[in-house]
Amino acid sequence: MKYSDYRKNIKAGDVIATSHRAKWYKSWYDLKISVVRAVTQSEYSHVGLVVNWGERLMVLEAVEPFVRIYPLSNIVNEVGEFYHVPMPFKIDLTGSGAFDYALGKVGQSYSQIDAMRSVFTRLKDDAKWECAEYVQAFLKVAGVDITDGIKSTPTDVVLALMRLGAGCILV
């Protein structure tokens, strides 16, 4: 499915997930992600939050070296495909304070150690982030707590949202 045709279905508050299924390793990053996917036996290697910035769809995400706001179209150009995880219910981004909360984390550090640790245990609350932990924290402020009993991996986030009725569409 072409992103340009599907784009209209993506709304603020939705989650995107990527798999990063590179057949050829172009960088050290490609190799690291492939190793993580193999060890965790996960389909998903990354998650982020969709927000609107005027007419643009942007993604709030925790990546090396910090939490950032990044155009979804750039992610599409870089990874080729992604999964759209539409929320099965309306999320109040502004009234709940979730949007301000997420924006307040922009520029904070990404923790590669936390990303590795998240496979085995729940993460402690600190000022360093990994992608799934960031999405979970945002959703909790928005009134959707998916932290109970799950670890902070991209796959855990996607599966928890699917249990609540979210879809998962390959774009």
What are the roles of these predicted feature ranges?
Residues M1-V171:
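Cysteine-nucleophile amide-bond enzymes
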